[in-house]
């Protein structure tokens, strides 16, 4: 196990959480759940048909006897769930529509979290990212003061004598780009694009802290301190100002090119005196293209292990798996998700 996960395991053994898996009969989920239960790290709720879950577990020789299996089709609290969802949706969906949605494991699992049956949820082994995030937005909703849900990746690499190097990158998976939200009635800017990117920076820094990173946040661009114009330069520049206003204690700077953010010798030339440049460990991208490409370059060419996407801005921890995930990735994302609780 990578060093990153040892303290997470210790933390969770001392303060056990309950996690919901929305795809309870998937072999990868079952293997990870069996390991979590055997280690006594988490309490586990599997959503699905009990007979199917147990048959799939038996086929893989996975012991999930300590897990609770809940089938939406015969759950005693289902009617209460429907009533709660109708109230949450405030006329946007009928009782019949809510009933149909709650028969689906992604909505059902999310409602278990909303109603306090579990602390967190991990899905997406067979669902799309949208099918994991949509119920979360509708039922769990965003935290007070949050304007958007975002994501980050935690990446680490064994650097030999230098030890384990750990960094954070956001947003690499959720927000395609950042535009102003306009008030339809007045035509005025309700939420500036720069405020949204600043929020991503602040939330990514908070996530970084959870996993042992003392965040030094670089808001990235192809420009350093006005060396370039156009594109998203103004967005990155203004986001730094907004982030400093929103969290004066945050160590954040930009706009910075990546070399100025990480290389002290470059920072000395391009932005001397910066408290972040040359030593950044938390990187904020101006659009999803840059973020997604950036973390995958670090993963595939830089030798970093990447964990995520870790969702940010929700009232409860809900995370999304890649449909190409393996059991080890499910296990590790389970630890990460529970530690957000």
Regions found by a protein language model. Give the residues of each.
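Anion-binding alpha/beta catalytic cores of soluble intermediary-metabolism enzymes, centered on
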Residues: 1-277, 281-341
């Amino acid at each position: 196990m990578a060093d990153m996960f040892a303290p997470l395991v210790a933390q969770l053994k001392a303060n056990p959480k309950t996690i919901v898996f929305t795809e309870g009969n998937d072999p990868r989920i079952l293997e990870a759940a069996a390991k979590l239960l055997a280690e006594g790290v988490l309490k586990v709720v599997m959503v699905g048909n009990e007979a199917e879950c147990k048959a799939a577990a038996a086929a893989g020789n996975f012991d999930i006897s300590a897990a609770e299996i809940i089938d939406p089709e015969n759950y005693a609290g289902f009617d209460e769930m429907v009533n709660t969802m109708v109230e949450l949706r405030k006329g946007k969906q009928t009782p019949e529509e809510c009933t149909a949605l709650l028969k689906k494991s992604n909505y059902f699992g999310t409602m278990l979290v909303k109603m306090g049956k579990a602390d967190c949820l991990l899905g997406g082994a067979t669902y799309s990212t949208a099918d994991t995030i949509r119920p979360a937005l509708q039922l769990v909703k965003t935290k007070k003061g949050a304007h958007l849900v975002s994501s980050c990746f935690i990446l680490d690499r064994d650097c030999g004598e230098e030890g384990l190097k750990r960094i954070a990158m956001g947003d690499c998976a959720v927000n395609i780009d950042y535009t102003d939200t306009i008030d339809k009635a007045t035509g005025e800017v309700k939420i500036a694009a720069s405020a949204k990117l600043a929020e991503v920076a602040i939330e990514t820094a908070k996530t970084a802290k959870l996993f042992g990173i003392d965040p030094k946040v670089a808001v990235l661009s192809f420009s350093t301190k006005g060396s370039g114009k156009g594109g998203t330069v103004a967005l990155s520049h203004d986001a730094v100002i907004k982030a400093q206003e929103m969290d004066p204690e945050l160590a954040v700077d930009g706009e910075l090119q990546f070399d100025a953010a990480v290389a002290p010798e470059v920072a000395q030339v391009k932005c001397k005196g910066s408290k972040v440049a040359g030593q950044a460990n938390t990187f904020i991208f101006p659009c999803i293209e840059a973020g997604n490409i950036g973390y995958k370059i670090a993963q595939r060419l830089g030798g970093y292990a990447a964990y995520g996407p870790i969702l940010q801005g929700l009232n409860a921890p809900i995370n999304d798996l890649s449909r190409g995930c393996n059991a080890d990735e499910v296990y590790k994302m389970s630890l990460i998700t529970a530690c957000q609780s």
